[in-house]
Swiss-Prot record:
Membrane topology of the entry: Peripheral membrane protein
Protein name: NADH-quinone oxidoreductase subunit D
Alphabetized InterPro entries for the sequence: NADH_Q_OxRdtase_suD (IPR001135), NADH_UbQ_OxRdtase_49kDa_CS (IPR014029), NDH1_su_D/H (IPR022885), NiFe-Hase_large (IPR029014)
Coiled coil stretches, renumbered: none
Family: Belongs to the complex I 49 kDa subunit family.
Subunit structure: NDH-1 is composed of 14 different subunits. Subunits NuoB, C, D, E, F, and G constitute the peripheral sector of the complex.
Species of provenance: Dehalococcoides mccartyi (strain ATCC BAA-2100 / JCM 16839 / KCTC 5957 / BAV1)
Length: 367
């Protein structure tokens, strides 16, 4: 007589060090193998979209910092660009260059944090994380110079910036650009050919091309599955069409490819930054924008390529100083929706390696 067995339901979280926020995973196990997964989120819901509809357009900028708080600069950019499009505000050329510089620095800083935490989840405790935070600290110091903040920068404004970059910013940035490629080489020497990392990541947590498209995956997760899609190239915004850079694409869609895409993207960000610093013009940093903004009635959707993927803002104006509708398209939520396709069939021991490779920030998921 065959022995009857039952699947085991295991809850991970909502307070777990590898979820990087309050988030619960409800997984169904057949022995050690995952047969089903349900992500349970909402623990960090703050009602940001509804709160934003009760405040002026300017007062809503700090809300964007608190979505993906590891990508605050790009969040600022996505939102102010949507409002500028809605209100017909022109941004000076110098301000556009500064925005590209800050966006690419933010991309590198976000990837450094994401990769450090990912390797921590793999079991490489502390050492790779501290190596990567060593370089991230230099970027945070640059952000501190221009915004006065190390987190939640609130630096962008409609039409540009209130304050120009301080004079010590560019010399410090040039030093960083000279040294950062060598440190990325160091990361690769330590990690990319490490036997344990390869065993834990190669062929693990594969997201197939069609599933990546069907789940609306974004950013490095999408490109690791072989989809050549990056808003900077496919729907250029700001002045990205002036720069030469490549879009890293992988083909296997596994945990290793998602790691490698971020390594390659940091190299391309350095390439963009060097061009932007070289071509940075003099001039105004603030376009003509009223202090109390009342965009004409209408609606707009604007998107950028953030560190985690396509970040979009949908705004509806009724002609007053407050938005009638304020909606975020968060890449972290979309990437999280693809998690089940990645983990089913793998052992529970592989779960955190796969989850860490999609680099989720719950502030953006729950909003």
């Amino acid at each position: 007589m065959a022995i009857k067995t039952e699947n085991f339901i295991l809850n991970i979280g909502p307070q777990h060090p590898s979820t990087h926020g309050v988030f619960r995973l409800r997984i169904v196990l057949d022995g050690e193998v995952i047969t089903d997964l349900e992500p349970v989120f909402g623990y960090l819901h703050r009602g940001i979209e509804k709160l934003a509809e009760g405040r002026t357009y300017l007062q809503d900028i700090p809300f964007t910092d608190r979505l993906d708080y590891l990508g605050s600069m790009t969040n600022n950019h996505a939102y102010v660009m949507a409002v500028e499009k809605l209100a017909g505000i022109t941004v000076p050329e110098r301000a556009e260059y500064i925005r590209v510089i800050l966006d690419e620095l933010q991309r590198i800083a976000s990837h450094l944090a994401g990769l450090g935490f990912f390797l921590n989840d793999l079991g490489a405790l502390q050492t790779p994380l501290l190596y990567m935070f060593r370089e991230r600290e230099k970027i945070v110091e640059l952000f501190d110079m221009c915004s006065g903040q190390r987190l939640n920068y609130n630096y962008y404004r409609f039409g540009g910036f209130v304050q120009d970059l301080p004079e010590e910013f560019l010399p410090a940035l040039k030093i960083l650009l000279d040294t950062l490629p060598g440190f990325i080489d160091e990361y690769e020497q330590l990690i990319s050919t490490n036997e344990i990392v390869l065993i834990r990541t190669k062929g693990v947590g594969v997201l197939k091309r069609d599933l990546a498209i069907n789940s609306s995956a974004a950013g490095p997760v999408l490109r690791a599955s072989g989809i050549n899609w990056d808003i900077r190239r496919n729907d250029p915004y700001s002045i990205y069409n002036r720069f030469e850079f490549d879009i890293p694409i992988a083909k296997n869609g596994d945990t290793y490819d998602r790691y490698m895409i971020r390594i390659l993207e940091m190299r391309q960000s350095v390439r963009i930054l060097r061009q932007a610093v070289k071509d940075l013009p003099e001039g105004e940093i603030m376009g003509k924008a009223p202090k109390l903004l009342k965009p004409p009635a209408g609606e707009v959707y604007s998107r950028i390529e953030g560190p985690k993927g396509e970040l979009g803002f949908y705004l509806v104006s009724d002609g007053t100083d407050k938005p009638y509708r304020w909606r975020v398209r968060p890449p972290c939520l979309l990437n999280l929706s693809a998690l089940k396709d990645m983990v089913v069939g793998w052992k529970v021991a592989d779960l955190m390696a796969i989850f860490g490779s999609i680099d989720i920030v719950m502030g953006e998921v729950d909003r």
